[in-house]
């Protein structure tokens, strides 16, 4: 792609959640037109886009209709549940799919990306197996051993994951994974439980005409398979950072294209173990809204458009903490914002989701401090001050 790209470009976002919303804001700051597409109305990114459409992204006919209507220059998937074979058709017709149609197809399913990393590229991963029935899951779990981790091969933001400590918990894990599976899949992956010191996300920026570059690693903590807090810098050794960068480059080079990739690793005392990869901004990377001179959404946009990224500057110890709903609500209302913002170097992002349900991520608190622990405490404290209720 030429570095002399002309603006504005017409960008179609498939999936319009909170990550998409921040991407739209970044895109519009450079004057681009954005069409936000999702399966429900008034999704976060739709609230700031130029145009929006509600479709089933698993429907080839629906995808064809919106692409024909808008004729985008770029198609940018933000979620996993998309009819990915249709993206290849669009790419063949000259539309740029980010990072590529083939890469999107690989990364929409945990089984494909795991096989690429482990079997084709020889990268160390947790031991794993697959199951498409409860009986198969019981057998594979016995083979992998306990504890293990059960996940849908396709899900959104870590939904459907559970740690299985004993054979008696396998059926519950199966039901939870299938209930939270996205798309057509009824397949789960079973992974060896890694006794890690820290989980990290390495935001990896693959460019059309320039070398791959990296953000400072981001540490994160999960519950129920979903991120609860993240922090930067992660506080791991330089040799492990270099090893993670080498692995991330190897995988993203195999996938091709351009854009930001969220590459997740388990860091143990002695090893750097590849976990997962998302070919888009990562939820744990929301900390970059406060921690970097260019956040992950701006970096994604620049990489997509072939614009230069001369410097990524980490601005000091920073953290994010999620703001979760605790009950089912229509038109949720937020209080405690003033209290949350009373501390210095704290910011709040409310995503504008039209409804709430237990554990739904409704916003994020961001904080900077003199060290990472203080930043984490400040972000968590700010998030705890925000209450969500009905009107």
Swiss-Prot record:
Keyword Nucleotide-binding assigned: yes
Enzyme Commission designation: 6.3.1.21
Protein residues bound to Mg(2+): 264, 276
Cellular component GO terms, alphabetical: cytosol
Keywords, alphabetical: ATP-binding, Ligase, Magnesium, Metal-binding, Nucleotide-binding, Purine biosynthesis
Binding-site residues for ATP, renumbered to this chain: 110, 151, 156-161, 191-194, 199
Major enzyme class: ligase
Catalytic activity: N(1)-(5-phospho-beta-D-ribosyl)glycinamide + formate + ATP = N(2)-formyl-N(1)-(5-phospho-beta-D-ribosyl)glycinamide + ADP + phosphate + H(+)
Binding site for N(1)-(5-phospho-beta-D-ribosyl)glycinamide: 18-19, 78, 283, 353, 360-361
Record domain ATP-grasp: where: 115-305
Pathway where it operates: Purine metabolism; IMP biosynthesis via de novo pathway; N(2)-formyl-N(1)-(5-phospho-D-ribosyl)glycinamide from N(1)-(5-phospho-D-ribosyl)glycinamide (formate route): step 1/1
Any GO BP: 'de novo' IMP biosynthetic process
GO MF, any single term: phosphoribosylglycinamide formyltransferase 2 activity
Family: Belongs to the PurK/PurT family.
Subunit structure comment from the entry: Homodimer.
Function, as annotated: Involved in the de novo purine biosynthesis. Catalyzes the transfer of formate to 5-phospho-ribosyl-glycinamide (GAR), producing 5-phospho-ribosyl-N-formylglycinamide (FGAR). Formate is provided by PurU via hydrolysis of 10-formyl-tetrahydrofolate.
Protein known as: Formate-dependent phosphoribosylglycinamide formyltransferase
Gene source species: Trichormus variabilis (strain ATCC 29413 / PCC 7937) (Anabaena variabilis)
Gene: purT
